Amino acid sequence: MAAPGAGDPLNAKNGNAPFAQRIDPSREKLTPAQLQFMRQVQLAQWQKTLPQRRTRNIMTGLGIGALVLAIYGYTFYSVAQERFLDELEDEAKAARARALERERASGP
C-alpha cells in the first residue's frame, strides 16, 4: 500500500503510472525541453552501458584474434608435418633411376 499523501500510484482511468509514459515523437509534437530531456536520458543510458559494451567488444576481439592465430599456427604445423610431396619426389627419382638403368641394360 502506498504511503499516505503519496497520491494514487496508478491512474485509475487508464492504468498507467504518472511517470515514464511512453510517447511516440513522430505522432506527438515535443517541446524543446522534452527533446533536451530525452537526449540527456539517452546520454546517461549510453554512458551507463558503455563500459560493459566495451568489455564485451574487447573480449570478442581477443577471442576472434586467438581463433585466427590458432588457425594460422595449425596451418604452419600441418604444412611442416606434411611429407607427402617429399615422398612423391623420392619415388619419382627412384623411377627415373630405374628407367635409366633399364635403358642402359637394354641399350647397344
Swiss-Prot record:
Keyword Coiled coil: yes
Region (Disordered): 1-25
Annotated InterPro entries: Coa3, Coa3_cc
Cellular component annotations (GO), alphabetically ordered: mitochondrial inner membrane; mitochondrion
Keyword Coiled coil set for record: yes
Membrane topology: Single-pass membrane protein
Keyword annotations: Acetylation, Coiled coil, Membrane, Mitochondrion, Mitochondrion inner membrane, Transmembrane, Transmembrane helix
Subcellular location(s) of the protein: Mitochondrion inner membrane
Gene Ontology terms describing biological process: mitochondrial cytochrome c oxidase assembly; positive regulation of mitochondrial translation
Segments in the Mitochondrial matrix topological domain: 2-57
Disulfide bonds: none
N-acetylalanine modification, residue list: A2
Endpoints of the signal sequence: none
Pfam families xref list: Coa3_cc (PF09813)
Coiled-coil residues: 78-106
Domain of life: Eukaryota
Membrane-traversing stretches: 58-80
Record topology, Mitochondrial intermembrane segments: 81-108
Description of how the protein assembles with itself and partners: Along with COX14, core component of the MITRAC (mitochondrial translation regulation assembly intermediate of cytochrome c oxidase complex) complex. Interacts with MT-CO1/COX1, SMIM20, SURF1 and TIMM21.
Function: Core component of the MITRAC (mitochondrial translation regulation assembly intermediate of cytochrome c oxidase complex) complex, that regulates cytochrome c oxidase assembly. MITRAC complexes regulate both translation of mitochondrial encoded components and assembly of nuclear-encoded components imported in mitochondrion. Required for efficient translation of MT-CO1 and mitochondrial respiratory chain complex IV assembly.
PANTHER family assigned: CYTOCHROME C OXIDASE ASSEMBLY FACTOR 3 HOMOLOG, MITOCHONDRIAL, CYTOCHROME C OXIDASE ASSEMBLY FACTOR 3, MITOCHONDRIAL
Family indicated by similarity: Belongs to the COA3 family.
Protein name: Cytochrome c oxidase assembly factor 3 homolog, mitochondrial
Gene: Coa3
